[in-house]
C-alpha cells in the first residue's frame, strides 16, 4: 500500500533530508482544494486531477509533532523550523537559496535578488548582465517551452533567453544543442555561430562544385537577419551576403545562366 504524504514526510525527517524531491521542508501543506496533506504543490499536482493554488494555502502540519496550524515559518508547538526560507505569499518553504519574492512575477525566484532585474515587457526576472542586451518579446515568459511544451514562468527550471528573445528551459536548451543550433520557433541561431561559419567558409572554398553547378545561383532567405540575397549555389551551405550567416534557406528555384541552358 502506498505511503501517505504524512508518512513520507516523517520518514524523510528520520532519514536526514526533509521534505520531498522538490523542496527541503519540515511541514506538509494542507491543500485548500481537497483538504489533503502534501509536502508541496508539485507532489499534490502529480497525484491529483487538479492543481493546488499555492496562494490559498492557510494551514500546514508539522512533520515532527504533527500539529496542524496556521501557515508560518516555525511550529507553534515544538519550534521546528519548517524552512530556512519562507514566503508568506507563495507559502514556499525551502532551504536558503537566497530566494526572493518578485511582486511583478507574482512568485518567488532563486536569487540573490541583486543579481536579477524584472523586465516589464518580457514579464520575467532576468540576470542583470542581460539588462539592455536582450531582445524583448512581450509576455514571453507566459508562453510554454517549445521543446517540452511545459510552463516556463512558474517552472523551477531556469529559463534560457535565446538571442531572438524566445525562452527555453535551460535543460531543454542544452538538449536541443545536441541535435541542432536553431530556435525551434523562429529558426534564428540559438548561439554565436561565428566561429563555425568561418570553418564553413574554409570548407566551401576547399570543395569546388562540379562544373555544371559553378555558375548556378539561388535566392536565399537568412534566418538570422531575415535578409534576402542571391548567391552561388553550394551543397555545403549558402552564405548570407548581409550578415555572413550560413543559417539560410533557399527561397526560390536555381538560376542557370542563359548560355548554359
UniProtKB/Swiss-Prot annotation:
Positions with a binding annotation for Zn(2+) 5:
102, 105, 118, 125
The entry's Zn(2+) 4-binding residues are 87, 90, 101, 108
Give the CTCHY-type zinc finger regions.
Answer: 82-144
Q: Where are the zinc fingers (RING-type)?
A: 145-189
Tell me where it resides. Nucleus; Nucleus speckle; Cytoplasm
Binding positions (Zn(2+) 2): 33-34, 44, 50
Which pathway is this protein engaged in?
Answer: Protein modification; protein ubiquitination
Q: How does it assemble?
A: Monomer and homodimer. Interacts with AR, MDM2, KAT5, PLAG1, PLAGL2, COPE, UBE2D2 and GORAB/NTKLBP1.
- Task performed by this protein: E3 ubiquitin-protein ligase that mediates ubiquitination of target proteins, including p53/TP53, TP73, HDAC1 and CDKN1B. Mediates ubiquitination and degradation of p53/TP53; preferentially acts on tetrameric p53/TP53. Catalyzes monoubiquitinates the translesion DNA polymerase POLH. Involved in the ribosome-associated quality control (RQC) pathway, which mediates the extraction of incompletely synthesized nascent chains from stalled ribosomes: RCHY1 acts downstream of NEMF and recognizes CAT tails associated with stalled nascent chains, leading to their ubiquitination and degradation.
According to UniProt, the name of this protein is RING finger and CHY zinc finger domain-containing protein 1
Q: Which organism is it from?
A: Mus musculus
Q: Which gene encodes it?
A: Rchy1
Amino acid at each position: 500500500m502506498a505511503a501517505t504524504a504524512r508518512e513520507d514526510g516523517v520518514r524523510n525527517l528520520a532519514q536526514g533530508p526533509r521534505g520531498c524531491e522538490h523542496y527541503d521542508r519540515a511541514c506538509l501543506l494542507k491543500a485548500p482544494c481537497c483538504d489533503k496533506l502534501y509536502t508541496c504543490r508539485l507532489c499534490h499536482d502529480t497525484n491529483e486531477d487538479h492543481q493546488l493554488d499555492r496562494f490559498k494555502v492557510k494551514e500546514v502540519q508539522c512533520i515532527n509533532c504533527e500539529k496542524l496550524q496556521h501557515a508560518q515559518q516555525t511550529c507553534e508547538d515544538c519550534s521546528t523550523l519548517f524552512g530556512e526560507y519562507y514566503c508568506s505569499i507563495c507559502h514556499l518553504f525551502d532551504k536558503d537559496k537566497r530566494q526572493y519574492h518578485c511582486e511583478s512575477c507574482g512568485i518567488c525566484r532563486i536569487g540573490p535578488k541583486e543579481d536579477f532585474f524584472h523586465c516589464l515587457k518580457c514579464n520575467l526576472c532576468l540576470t542583470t548582465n542581460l539588462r539592455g542586451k536582450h531582445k524583448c518579446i512581450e509576455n514571453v515568459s507566459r508562453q510554454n517551452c517549445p521543446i517540452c511544451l511545459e510552463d516556463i514562468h512558474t517552472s523551477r527550471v531556469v529559463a534560457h533567453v535565446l538571442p531572438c528573445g524566445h525562452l527555453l528551459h535551460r535543460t531543454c536548451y542544452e538538449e536541443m544543442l545536441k541535435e541542432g543550433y536553431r530556435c525551434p520557433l523562429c529558426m534564428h541561431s540559438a548561439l554565436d555561430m561565428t566561429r563555425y561559419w568561418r570553418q564553413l567558409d574554409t570548407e566551401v572554398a576547399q570543395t569546388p562544385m562540379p562544373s555544371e553547378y559553378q555558375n548556378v545561383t539561388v535566392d536565399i532567405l537568412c534566418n538570422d537577419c531575415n535578409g534576402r540575397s542571391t548567391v552561388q549555389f553550394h551543397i555545403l551551405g549558402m552564405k548570407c551576403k548581409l550578415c555572413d550567416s550560413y543559417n539560410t534557406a533557399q527561397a526560390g528555384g536555381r538560376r542557370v545562366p542563359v548560355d548554359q541552358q
